[in-house]
């Protein structure tokens, strides 16, 4: 295990040195052994006979770590803030994983930094447990995401209305480059920094662009970032994830999900679903996420206008044309995803319509998204589910069965294919709240660990899976999530 600090070479405009806060009594709460092994952290700890709690709470520094808080700006709910930055996070450095990819290792909740703007720099145990469970569930679902290596309780209290136990999350991500990182320099008119940042992003995420130059490099870069966002949002829609705070400072260049603050899962299918208490206008509602990703990509494109062409009119035309590809690319990828969930091969518009009709039925009947697709998948190989689906959706199910038959693949094969896109279990909101409450009340991670066993196999029926499949009694109508906790 060798920590590197490549980000620091970008120059001191990009970050501010900041030392994590000393916790009074760091205790390991949750630990991701698989991730620790893949990063060489497990071997390091075994060799040194060290406990992870000190290193992953900020109490002690890993060898060669030079902690910094990263500078970034961001559009929050549409309004630009030129200076946000890591107000409660410390980048410890980078580690090379067993697949040779390089990952950032960052602490969150590790104390105030020069970017804290009056905030306390801390994190409560509840949100830390949420970040661990959600990110690990998303990774197991196959959704691009930052990971969580550890949650360490600090032994200190954090004030969030009441006193709550404090914790530090250790996050591992392909990088922490955000759209807001580019916006930070664009707002300062620092074209040179944007060029350097772009080269750095290419070296970490898009090495295939390394040999391109000039405007071609920049349009290639934008296309590559757009494509990752298209993929990411399609994956969110596939599993029913609502990010909740898709500000440009929470939008990564790598295309990974980051910041599990006010996120939630839909139960009843409704594109207008919004859970975040501060999202009064529903800007970040479930079905609006593709448009917001597009809007965020427009903010990124703006930062590149001076680099796309010297003539500003020409540059705007190039930017608009690149952005114009986004909705079409999204539609195409989305229909493909929906068809995979529905088991249909897309051979024409009538296949698209068949898949969309199913969503309309779920909406009209107020049905659970995950369980309905699960039942549809099972109906191909289980007569009980077949009867249930046939009576729930008489006309549609007949049309669908006929189409599946017509497309000529054996039912078992179609069911297997659908299963890869339809989880049997997701991190449902009511279970999340119950598990977090239990962890805090008992001062024990056991409830989280039992749930994680199931969430790490979201496409399989384990003996304890049924404990977590029930939709919320009220369809989550009164469920609310909160930011900045
Ligand atoms: N308790 C806090 N103290 C200081 N700064 C904070 C605190 N909570 C949030 N911030 C800062 O406010 C901004 C927006 O917060 P947001 O909730 O999006 O991020 P976050 O959850 O802290 O971190 P990340 O995006 O890295 O997951 C960020 O600059 C963040 O560092
Ligand atoms: Mg954030």
UniProtKB/Swiss-Prot annotation:
Disordered: region residues: 462-485
UniProt-listed Enzyme Commission number(s): 2.7.7.-, 2.7.7.108
Name of protein: Protein nucleotidyltransferase YdiU
InterPro entries: SelO
Pfam family, one: SelO
Task of the protein: Nucleotidyltransferase involved in the post-translational modification of proteins. It can catalyze the addition of adenosine monophosphate (AMP) or uridine monophosphate (UMP) to a protein, resulting in modifications known as AMPylation and UMPylation.
PANTHER family: PROTEIN ADENYLYLTRANSFERASE SELO, MITOCHONDRIAL (PTHR32057:SF14)
Cofactors demanded by this protein: Mg(2+); Mn(2+)
Keyword annotations of the record: ATP-binding, Magnesium, Manganese, Metal-binding, Nucleotide-binding, Nucleotidyltransferase, Transferase
Active site per the UniProt annotation: 249
GO molecular function, one term: AMPylase activity
Binding site residues for Mg(2+): 250, 259
Organism of this sequence: Teredinibacter turnerae (strain ATCC 39867 / T7901)
Catalytically driven reaction(s): L-seryl-[protein] + ATP = 3-O-(5'-adenylyl)-L-seryl-[protein] + diphosphate; L-threonyl-[protein] + ATP = 3-O-(5'-adenylyl)-L-threonyl-[protein] + diphosphate; L-tyrosyl-[protein] + ATP = O-(5'-adenylyl)-L-tyrosyl-[protein] + diphosphate; L-histidyl-[protein] + UTP = N(tele)-(5'-uridylyl)-L-histidyl-[protein] + diphosphate
Entries under HAMAP family matching the protein: YdiU_SelO
Family: Belongs to the SELO family.
Positions bound to ATP: 85, 87-88, 108, 120-121, 171, 178, 259
